[in-house]
Amino acid sequence: ERNALPADVSLSESTERTATLDIASRELKDFWKGEGRVLLRVSKDGVMRDGFTICRKGLDVELSSASDNGVLYAAYDLLRRQQAGDLLSDGVAVTERPSYDIRILNHWDNPDGTVERGYAGRSIWKWDELPETVSPLYEEYARANASVGINAVVLNNVNAKPQMLSTGMLRKVAVIAEVLRPYGIRTYLSVNFASPKALGELSP
């Protein structure tokens, strides 16, 4: 349930504001129920890559990482602990490190909206509406993935259509990537190696 009044969340003095940290702050302001302050810190001395540390000091909590993405993952971890009734005791710190650097989802979605071996309806990507219309589901998708540490996604079927590398489709892909990027998610495409021939009308 969203808070009626925003929680007390701030960045450390040495931490620069970014789109990713804005998301972490917003999530905590909306859903953190703790009475104390939450401090977000990005430090080069912190846990490497996307790892993070959560430290409880009285009523206050500090989330720290070597990266913005790590702080975002820490925010989601803190909210998950709150939901599960597993909050840290005073003076206790917990450190988490992902086992894999790339944690990727691979879609088997086609440009026409069908999904190869798909059993849950049509593709979430509305290629016919992009780039003019951007579904709010894209950000919810990014949010859900970031909350469990997913940091990469392949948008299309491994049996790729050449048109995925057309100028028009790449403009649409760029719009999706722009939505996913602040959530720490990199965008990938499967490619058909005959695309230059198919799109450029090259002879063999």
For each predicted feature, which ranges?
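Acidic, contiguous N-terminal accessory segments
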Residues: E1-G58, A66, L88-A93
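Feature activates predominantly on carbohydrate-active enzymes
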Residues: E27, G46-P204
